[in-house]
Amino acid sequence: MLNAIVDGLWREGDKSLAVRLVAETGDALPAWQPGAHIDVHLPCGVVRQYSLTGACGDESYLICVGREAASRGGSRYVHETLRPGQRLSISAPRNLFPLHQAERVLLLAAGIGITPLYAMALQLKATGTPFTLHYYVRNRENAAFARELSQCGDCIIHTTTPRTTLAEHFPAPEAGLHAWVCGPAGFMEKARDVAAAKGWNDAHIHSEAFQPAPPVTSGVAGEIFTVKLASTGERWPVPADKTIAQVLQENGVDVPLSCEMGICGACLTPVIDGVVDHRDSVQSEAEKSAADQQVALCCSRSHSGELVIAL
């Protein structure tokens, strides 16, 4: 864990708050690359993940937090209570959404999904890689980093709904063209549908969710399964109204939780035996169907009566 100080706060558009963090020691914070995020332990008792944004060569960290009407505590605290000079505990950066080398890049962002893609745009500009960024917001006043994006190259802010215009902005597939998509689950589902209709290779589409996908109901309502620890043989029932993580914590098992929505990957745990009912948004379909699978303890369940995990 790293100790950081809030070095600055400012508005980015009318719904987002930028937060600059510096190391309490005055040293440079650990290096990162576009697509990385950190866990922020807020004084209100919640842990939230925020994408790092801005220039990745800076010694400080920049995050941008959207104001959520249905906040579970994180965005409300940041917008209403956080102040310059406050001390926060943060994790080292993790990157589940890296920017790979490509001949050309398409960036598609909706809402606060702009945060990792703004960092990618700066990196692509610095390396001379051709790119186009389409950024969808409800109105111009909602846009974060609007001034910076206007100076960053081919960055276009749209106030039209992506449901009706995304197909116009999605080019035909090319061998060296890759797309990075970030925003609400519905936006990314639409982007993937458009890409599939145009013949894109799924391996050329890279995405990160800022909201969990809608829950998928499977099996019998109220079905109970058993989770078993491979290391000790201990097993406990997981009722329909509790997650695997909650059951493990109730029985004294340390679980690395962060988002608790299946969008960060912090609680992914290898599966030894059993059939996972995947409900996370962080793993690809290929990862969810691979021989060596992982289960998101915060949200996923089991199709089999028992799930044996590597804990």
Model segments located where?
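Local cysteine-cluster metal-coordination motifs and their immediate loop/turn environment
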Residues: P116, V253-S281, S289-S304
